[in-house]
Swiss-Prot record:
Gene3D superfamilies: 1.10.286.20, DNA helicase RuvA subunit, C-terminal domain, Elongation factor Ts, dimerisation domain
Pfam families xref list: EF_TS (PF00889)
Subcellular location field: Cytoplasm
Cellular component aspect of the GO annotation: cytoplasm
Protein name as it appears in the record: Elongation factor Ts
Amino acid sequence: MSKINLEDLKSLSKETSAGLVHCKQALSEAHGDLTRAREILKELGHAVSVKKANRGARDGVVGALSSGKFGVILELNCETDFVARNEKFQQFAQSVLEAACAAKVKSVEECLSTPLPGGQKVRDAIVEQVAVFRENIVLSRCVTYEVSQSGLLGVYVHNKYTENLGKIGVAVAVVSEADPSFLSTVAKDIAIQVMSECPCAIDVARIPPNLLESEKHKYNLEVEGKPASVAEKIIAGKLSKFYKKVVLLEQPLFSDPERSVKQYISDKEMESSAKIDVVWYEVFVLGEAS
C-alpha cells in the first residue's frame, strides 16, 4: 500500500466531506494522486447512489428562501433524522436552496441542473452526498414564485434547524405599494397563519370546485324534508362555518381570533394607506409528499 500523505488525506476529506476511511482508500488506490482520488470518490458516490436509490427517504429538511420578489420552497430528503440534523447536510441543503433562488428555477428538474458555487450541478452533488452520508438523498419537491408587480414574497420556517431550514416551510406572495419592510411583516404574519390553520384557498372564489360541491351536497342531504326557507338558512350557516375553516381570508387570525385575516389585512391597509392583496401561497410539511 502506498504511503498516504496526512495533509492530502485531511484536504481530500475536507474538500469532499467524505469520511477519512474512504479518502484513505481512494488515495491508496490512486497512489497518492489527489486528482485521481477525487475521481475515485465520485465513482464511489455514483455506485452508492445507485445502490441506495430505492431506499425510502422520508426525513430531511424543508427550505424556504426569498430574494424579495422571487422565492423558492423545496424539500431535500434523507433517510434519518440523524443525517437531517447533521450540520454538513444542512449546509448542503442551504447551498441548493440559494442556488435555486439565484437561478430562479421553476421545477425540480431545473433545480437539479443548476450549478452550485463550485460549478458542480445539484444532481451530481447529491450523488456525492449519498456517498458521504451513506443514505439515499432526494430532492423531492421544488416550487417557486415571482411577484411581477409591486410587492414581495415572504417566507416562514417552523421547527427550525437554521434560519431557512426546518420541518415546515411557507411562502406567501403579497402585492402592494406599501413600504417593503412593512409589507414583509404582513407577509410573515400571513405565512404563520397558513402554517397554523392550513387553508385550502385564499378566498371563497378559489375553493376547489369539487370540494365546495361535496360540502354543499352533504348539507343538502342534512336538510332534506325541511321547509325551503329554513333549509336555505341552515345551509348558509354551515357554509359560513366551512369558509372560516378552509378559506384564508375568512379564517380567524391565529394571533388574534377576534379578527379575521381579512380584517387584519384591512387594518394594515389603513395603517399603510395602500391596498394589500395576498395572491399566492405554498406550504411544505416534511414528508407529506412521500
